[in-house]
Amino acid sequence: MSKARVYADVNVLRPKEYWDYEALTVQWGEQDDYEVVRKVGRGKYSEVFEGINVNNNEKCIIKILKPVKKKKIKREIKILQNLCGGPNIVKLLDIVRDQHSKTPSLIFEYVNNTDFKVLYPTLTDYDIRYYIYELLKALDYCHSQGIMHRDVKPHNVMIDHELRKLRLIDWGLAEFYHPGKEYNVRVASRYFKGPELLVDLQDYDYSLDMWSLGCMFAGMIFRKEPFFYGHDNHDQLVKIAKVLGTEALNAYLNKYHIELDPQLEALVGRHSRKPWSKFINADNQHLVSPEAVDFLDKLLRYDHQDRLTAREAMAHPYFLQVRAAENSRARPQ
């Protein structure tokens, strides 16, 4: 059995009410308090709008959920309630439903996001360090509360660059971590899926989020979005193997007694490890430092138990400047 290196027993030690989302009784608010202003996005499970709270004229985000199992909606709500107030976690303000259709909507705090395809190419070396550090705060917090996000990707990281404010959003795939539990591997978005999902290892843990973060980080520093560009789940593992090599992949599979299905094994083939230096070019060299590469290398590991935890990641030398700036703000001279 594989078990998380950190925060493994959070839900074992908490009362059942904390993680038993199926028992949740939803307190419905008043739908008429909110009006839709404009559509800002859509996902597989929802449509998202900028809205306004008509009582105080404050902007908000309205996430109208598509017909999905009640259980899944309860899970998302319970997780958002448990995490509310945590660093850089999007705040759930209200839950309402349509009187007639019974369609539920989640009301969130407003974030003036710039699309990552526009924002990321403009970010400086320091900006990337700053925002990844802010994202790590959210991940360490949710992990410390016994929750895996399971869908970390640029689309789910809202950044208001003017205010230098980051929020981790879309907790629809998030789940409570219970040691030894076997989870669905059909989570996360293809380019950000950890090897554990691609080889069908079900007793994964928080470290899945650290792989996704690594993919996101690689895309940012190498200006290659997405970094691992697979055309389907099998091809996704092939793309990873062409960078990390097949020797380390086989060591991983052997350690956890995993057999690849023969078709996938044939597709993966044999590849040597590609050094990170091969991804450096004139366009991205100003973002790639030895510390950045060392940090990336400690995230993008096949073996989920070898990856940095969010807390360990925050202590990495790559964030030295960010930590120094934070400390001087906390203790003004």
UniProtKB/Swiss-Prot annotation:
Stored InterPro entries: CK2_alpha, Kinase-like_dom_sf, Prot_kinase_dom, Protein_kinase_ATP_BS, Ser/Thr_kinase_AS
EC supergroup of this enzyme: transferase
Active site: 151
PROSITE patterns linked to this entry: PROTEIN_KINASE_ATP, PROTEIN_KINASE_DOM, PROTEIN_KINASE_ST
Oligomer and partners: Monomer.
Family: Belongs to the protein kinase superfamily. Ser/Thr protein kinase family. CK2 subfamily.
Protein name per Swiss-Prot or TrEMBL: Casein kinase II subunit alpha-2
Protein species of origin: Oryza sativa subsp. indica
Gene name of the encoded protein: HD6
